[in-house]
């Protein structure tokens, strides 16, 4: 069973007081020092990488959650990164592909809850599309256990493990097939 981080955090991160009460659904407030902690969603990215043969690059998840299911290359945006920079970094980390940030196109976003270390991490998943040559060399690394190119008409939504990825793949296929 997972919990929202605001249910787990019991002490003020500024002064250490136990007088750290729920302020509203998104925050806790410390009665001792006046600090208010807001739990905002984390930015996350995922890529629809298409080659010139019209195939989608799909990863097999190498780690929990949903280890062994299909996924899109992507991950969390780091501090001080733009969404595009985070997307380019994640693509390189998981596939070895080097993509020009100017060549990725934003598609849409989906709010999500990502369960990790027993907590519900609220995310805003940003989806991008980019195109590569059909002979682009890919190597599975980081969170990706395996990579495969799949023709769009052979992509099955139910094989993707994460809810927001399934929703995004369904939406992308509806717009592009």
Each model region followed by its residue ranges:
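Short metal-coordination and nucleic-acid-contact micro-motifs, chiefly zinc-binding Cys/His arrays
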Residues: 5-11, 26, 43
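Short cysteine-rich clusters marking metal-coordination/redox-active sites
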Residues: 12-15, 30-33
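Short functional micro-motifs and their immediate structural scaffolds
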Residues: 20-21, 38
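Conserved N-terminal beta-strand and adjoining loop/helix that marks the start
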Residues: 32-56, 76
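Active-site-adjacent beta-strand/loop module that shapes the phosphate/pyrophosphate-binding cleft
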Residues: 108-137
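NUDIX/MutT-family hydrolases
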Residues: 138-169
